Amino acid sequence: MKKIGLLLTIFSLCLGCLGLVPSDKAHAGNLNLTTWPSASILAVESRTVNNADKKLGEIGEKLDLNNSPLRSFRKYRGMFPTIAAQIVDNAPYEKVEDVLEMPGLTEEQKKLLEANLKNFTVTKTADVYNEGDYRLNTGSYD
């Protein structure tokens, strides 16, 4: 039985390689590059934006004192982890200058914060960044 199966397989392969088995021709796609999709199709497509991306659009390049995770403060020398943890623990803030009124700041820490005030912004707290201690541990370990 195995020999019959083997012979049938070899015979089928030989016929297929010789082209004796009838088959349909392949149908190629339309490669005409001058045809563009109609404008009506493009107008229907919409882009959805999640809440986290929407908040990032509000913030821009600055670091949001009410919503940024602890690890984001690493890009400012001397801020991570001590001052950054104090900022996160004492949030929310009404304005950027409120960060200078945190309890327990040394004069050196105040000077460091004053030097970086231009890099900070304050927006309303967003649940997407503050629920579940996300600001303390974002889950990215680089």
Curated annotation (Swiss-Prot):
One of the Pfam families matching this protein, by short name: PsbU
Q: How does it sit in the membrane?
A: Peripheral membrane protein
Keywords assigned: Electron transport, Membrane, Photosynthesis, Photosystem II, Signal, Thylakoid, Transport
* UniProt feature coiled coil, ranges: none
Please name the GO terms of the biological process aspect recorded for this protein, alphabetically.
photosynthesis; photosystem II stabilization
Keyword Membrane tagged: yes
Q: Which GO terms describe its cellular component?
A: extrinsic component of membrane; photosystem II oxygen evolving complex; plasma membrane-derived thylakoid membrane
The lineage's top-level taxon is Bacteria
Keyword Thylakoid annotated: yes
Location in the cell reads: Cellular thylakoid membrane
Q: Which segment of the chain is annotated as a signal peptide?
A: 1-28
| Gene3D superfamilies tied to this protein | Photosystem II 12 kDa extrinsic protein
| HAMAP family given in the database record | PSII_PsbU (MF_00589)
Q: How does it assemble?
A: PSII is composed of 1 copy each of membrane proteins PsbA, PsbB, PsbC, PsbD, PsbE, PsbF, PsbH, PsbI, PsbJ, PsbK, PsbL, PsbM, PsbT, PsbX, PsbY, PsbZ, Psb30/Ycf12, peripheral proteins PsbO, CyanoQ (PsbQ), PsbU, PsbV and a large number of cofactors. It forms dimeric complexes.
- Protein family membership: Belongs to the PsbU family.
Q: What does this protein do?
A: One of the extrinsic, lumenal subunits of photosystem II (PSII). PSII is a light-driven water plastoquinone oxidoreductase, using light energy to abstract electrons from H(2)O, generating a proton gradient subsequently used for ATP formation. The extrinsic proteins stabilize the structure of photosystem II oxygen-evolving complex (OEC), the ion environment of oxygen evolution and protect the OEC against heat-induced inactivation.
**Protein's name according to its UniProt entry:** Photosystem II extrinsic protein U
Originating species: Trichodesmium erythraeum (strain IMS101)
